[in-house]
Amino acid sequence: MKLLIVCIVKHIEKNGKYYGYAPYVREMNLWGNYVDEIIVVAPIKEVDIIDEIDSAYNHAHIRFTQVPNFNILSVWETFKAFFKIPVIFVQCLFAMAKADHIHLRCPGNISLVACVAQIFFPNKKKSTKYAGNWDPNSNQPWTYRLQQTILRNTFLTRNMQVLVYGEWPNETRNIQPFISATYYEDEKIEFQPKDYTQPLSFVFAGALVIGKRPFLTIQIIESLFQKGISVRLHMYGDGPLMPELQDYVKRNGLETVVFLYGNQDKSVVKASLMDAHFNILPSKSEGWPKAVAEGMFFGCIPIATPVSCVGWMLGDGTRGILIEPELETAVSQIVTALNNADLDAMAKAALEWSQQYTFDRLEEDIRGVLFVRD
């Protein structure tokens, strides 16, 4: 079987291997276990510097078709896009003609072009992993909405399984819940009650960017500390906000409360989650909130905003604490939970839910997508 992957992930070619964003490549290597050849249509980075977050495909037979990246964020970029889009469209058509199974990674500008191209192959087996927020009531770019509209339309999009995060009402028959995973079956642990009589350990794992709201996270912990609650916040991840966050911690005398570690190995984050009481992520938007699911896997109670499928993951508050993205309200909601909720029951429910979705199960689910029966 020849598997075609169309995605926006910028790749690096070095020493005959192709590298990309590690969580994406790690999953695509699972798809590769069941196919004879992989065809990738994606952009290539101009530099060949491999970052810690990059990983290589492990399949022996990979063909790569480079396409230009584009955006429509300015008049000049929109003008250039008019010349790039036809090139991408034709490249997608050629690659799709060669493939036995067409797999799109949405949302993204290149995948939008691919969404249109796949219409011309109604009889080929197809799948789409929609790695963004599928919530029909959320505020999203019109290009994302257009991709969702095309994918939902069973006349335009035939023979396609659309894999989305969470369960959503009133969807077309080709929209299917599909849960990503980080840990294997043999990494499961038994639930162990924790002592919530302080000090309380919180973990933030994510990019230090505006969308993840790391400033709000620190301010929540600061406010809890000022209320006399013994708390510690361990932050894993890097990004453009790191200098400002470090300065805020120093200026406000939080050096013994907030600890910024930057990017760390997966094993370091895992150990911290196993030891922590809470996992906090007050994001503006999420596709699959990976960090939340990872904490839940070890009985770490999630504290998160109800974006995307988070409310579904947290059982509308039975498996975690849902907060609003406003400081005083969020702090009040957390304090209420600390005083009134059965935290052990909440942590146990979080662990049991997340441990349903292992990497082993993900591999079986992928096999089911590739070899779906008519």
Can you annotate each of these PLM segments?
Residues 316-327, 336-341:
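Conserved acidic donor-binding segment of nucleotide-sugar-dependent glycosyltransferases
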Residues 254-257, 342-357, 368:
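A short, well-ordered alpha-helix in the C-terminal region of glycosyltransferases
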